[in-house]
């Protein structure tokens, strides 16, 4: 059993009581919250935890963290759930050591996934080998939050230490992608699924930031320095320093020194290269830059995103540059911002035209101090569930019954986070 049904039921009843004015929210919340626990989580023979992303039979390092993060509230009082989350960290770190460039993995070494179409250094554990900086940020975030929220430290084992070293090494190598062994080519007509220049990626100059091949949408980067992911890296490198200083883990001194250096260099790169101006002449963050003078003004609905910067802990909600960036990306100046009959929000190159993502609507609510805006977004999310009672990857702004992905656990859990945030359960 991955959790105590009695403890979780008691907690759900407490949430329902707090939200009794909003029965529609409660209905969707309970369905989403229990579905992830009951249908995506599996405890493996070694005690580690595998978390299915939903309707794709694989585990993403990013998604799995986001899927279990809302359970940290209950994990304080449920030892089984606490061990389930610690088991996920252990599985994530083990898989990172199988290949730190991969974004998603199989439950066993079964060679399932994109092996027939992809030209890259694959092994049987890998479902897909699209290198995304955030895939390495998320497991560090979960390990840290589990410790801070519950006091759990069993996740900080020898594998965690070794994987942390590997992450620091990879991010350092990718500060100059010319030194990288990573290449990725897919046999496809969809240009977003492969890298240009024979799998090397687009042209760039060294900036101090760390290079990324793909976005958290699993679409390739137009320019190779993805600003939201570098922001996230700065945050989790601070977590690494705090963990190793407080718990005196193996090789603490060298790991702290490497994390501190890398954090400073990436932050300096952000400060030197990440800014641009919007159509009003306001200073904003670019979404991607290449160090050669090119920058994109847009945002993607997946997390990390520019919209999510305060949610990730990179800046305050009232930060002036963030607010200018927020206004820009929630406007037609962002080519992936769509407005329609039922909703408005962020879409993606990964999905159809005029389809927006519930994940981004949840993040919009989690990054405002305006209670009325949070309520409006929650009402919108529930009204746009396509009659299914759960969230989806995306839906059409003029017809929510048109949506992508029947079962997308990450979106379900982001909705749950926004409900808890609205109820001041943090």
Where are each of the predicted segments found?
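Extended ligand-binding clefts on enzyme/binding-domain cores
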Residues: 97-101, 108, 168-234, 247-249, ...
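Well-ordered alpha-helical scaffold segments within catalytic/enzyme domains
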Residues: 7-21, 66-79, 138-153, 231-251, ...
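Aromatic-rich carbohydrate-recognition surfaces in CAZymes
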Residues: 57-85, 89-191, 409-425
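Extended, well-ordered alpha-helical scaffold segments
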Residues: 28, 79-95, 152-172, 240-243, ...
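C-terminal capping/lid segments that line or modulate ligand- or cofactor-binding pockets
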Residues: 118-124, 129-132, 296-316, 354-426
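Active-site-adjacent bridging/hinge elements
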Residues: 36-46, 110-118, 203-215, 336, ...
């Amino acid at each position: 059993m991955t959790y105590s049904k009695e403890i979780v039921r008691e907690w759900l009843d407490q949430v329902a009581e707090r939200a009794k004015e909003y029965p529609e929210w409660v209905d969707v919340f309970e369905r989403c919250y229990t579905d992830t626990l009951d249908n995506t989580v599996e405890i493996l023979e070694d005690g580690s935890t595998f978390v299915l992303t939903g309707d794709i039979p694989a585990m993403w390092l990013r998604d799995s963290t986001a899927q279990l993060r809302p359970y940290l509230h209950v994990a304080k009082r449920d030892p089984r759930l606490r061990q389930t989350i610690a088991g996920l960290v252990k599985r994530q770190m083990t898989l990172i050591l199988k290949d730190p460039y991969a974004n998603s993995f199989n439950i066993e070494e079964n060679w399932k996934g994109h092996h027939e179409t992809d030209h890259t250094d694959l092994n049987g554990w890998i479902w897909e080998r699209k290198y995304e900086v955030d895939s390495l940020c998320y497991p560090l975030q979960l390990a840290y939050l589990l410790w801070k929220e519950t006091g759990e430290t069993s996740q900080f084992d020898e594998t965690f230490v070794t994987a942390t070293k590997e992450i620091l090494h990879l991010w350092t190598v990718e500060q100059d992608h010319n030194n990288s062994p990573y290449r990725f080519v897919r046999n496809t007509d969809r240009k977003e699924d492969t890298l240009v220049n024979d799998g090397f990626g687009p042209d760039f100059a060294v900036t101090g930031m760390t290079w990324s091949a793909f976005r958290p949408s699993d679409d390739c980067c137009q320019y190779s320095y993805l600003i939201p992911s570098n922001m996230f890296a700065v945050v989790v490198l601070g977590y690494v320093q705090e963990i190793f200083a407080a718990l005196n883990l193996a090789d603490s001194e060298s790991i702290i020194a490497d994390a501190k250096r890398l954090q400073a260099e990436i932050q300096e790169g952000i400060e030197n290269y990440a800014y641009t101006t919007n159509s009003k002449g306001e200073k904003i963050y670019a979404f991607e830059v290449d160090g050669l003078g090119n920058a994109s003004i847009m945002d993607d609905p997946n997390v990390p995103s520019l919209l999510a910067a305060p949610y990730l802990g990179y800046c305050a909600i009232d930060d002036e540059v963030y607010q200018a960036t927020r206004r820009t990306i929630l406007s037609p100046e962002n080519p992936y911002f769509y407005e329609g009959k039922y909703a408005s929000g962020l879409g993606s190159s990964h999905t159809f035209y005029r389809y927006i993502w519930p994940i981004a609507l949840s993040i919009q609510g989690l990054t405002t101090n305006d209670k009325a805006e949070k309520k409006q977004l929650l009402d919108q999310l529930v009204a746009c569930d396509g009659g299914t009672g759960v969230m989806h990857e995306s839906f059409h702004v003029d017809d929510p019954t048109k949506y992508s992905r029947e079962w997308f656990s990450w979106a379900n859990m982001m909705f749950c986070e926004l409900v808890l945030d609205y109820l001041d359960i943090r």
